């Protein structure tokens, strides 16, 4: 794979002031000698000249030269800074490919090469991709912590603890005659395993919060027809996306939108009003409402406070323990006496008076902004959970009467699952799967 040369537009297919075309591999400098009228630079040098095709000038550019491994990719690399028109940039890329000395890079292939060349580990590689795709401040900070290695230290600490236990077992197996070696029975080993499991549980608990950071907090707006769900969604996303009408059952399908609060991304779902109905299409919409409730992290149950005979929807009973449920009374502007609702979340979507709701949501999810050190993406969480399962298998073996020489097999599996987070893997398909999600040219 690393014996060929790759190229791609690193700055995206849009009109812009400056575009970047990246070439990496053993033929990078040779290609430039064919298409560049200007000085071939030394490593870490910038030179000025023309890109040409058989002396037909195409664009005046700046070229950054990186020889050897003194760059992100870890091999000979050239970056052409051209005028950023889409046509102009693609003409240069086509000219590079025309030399037959390079092929078009796959998505994420420059980062993959950086990983294979030992310039970055898998955590840092994924952090780069997360930085690129961050939509809100908390996502950006989480990705930056990953890139700086802050999260890695927590996982490395677990790896070291597993290695320590494996080492003790191996010494007992290989050198049983040594007087200064602690005799390792199941009774001695089990407390160490239990402590290890407690450490895994603590890390998984913290890591699971990362999903809310990376994927956004799925927020479902539910309630009876005409309670003000659509009005609230339009206020939150600052857009008239949901249809507002006095006719019950106007919203038939799930309407989606995003909003940012306190640096966190909330993904909103406005659902069909829930009520008893014989209308087939409306029934389908109500079924989708219940499906959205199941998927939500935050359930906002909107109730018309002005309605005397309110429909009793016991939606709280449908919420899981891991879901946040909030009952919100809307249409405060129609109330003569608000005393009944003094302990409730009372809003007026019509007049955009929702400050108390926003403050409540901020207070509930404030903990996500406080975890500045450890975050994990879905791949990393999966590996940590697989590691824990292997430790549980080791514990089961010991409790079933098997000796440490059996438990060590599962401990080594746990060790491997955690090491995979950093890219110590032999599975090429796994690497392809991870890096294929990256941008072209990265």
UniProtKB/Swiss-Prot annotation:
PROSITE patterns: G_TRME. It comes from the Bacteria. This is tRNA modification GTPase MnmE. It is an enzyme of class 3 (hydrolase). Homodimer. Heterotetramer of two MnmE and two MnmG subunits. Residues 216-366 form the TrmE-type G domain. GO terms for biological process: tRNA methylation; tRNA wobble uridine modification. Mg(2+) binds at residues 230, 251. (6S)-5-formyl-5,6,7,8-tetrahydrofolate binds at residues 22, 79, 119, 442. Its cofactor is K(+). Keywords: Cytoplasm, GTP-binding, Hydrolase, Magnesium, Metal-binding, Nucleotide-binding, Potassium, tRNA processing. SUPFAM superfamilies: Folate-binding domain (SSF103025), P-loop containing nucleoside triphosphate hydrolases (SSF52540), TrmE connector domain (SSF116878). Disulfide bonds: none annotated. GO terms for molecular function: GTP binding; GTPase activity; metal ion binding. CDD domains: trmE, TrmE_N. Gene3D superfamilies: P-loop containing nucleotide triphosphate hydrolases, Probable tRNA modification gtpase trme, domain 1, tRNA modification GTPase MnmE domain 2. It is found in: Cytoplasm. GTP binds at residues 226-231, 245-251, 270-273.
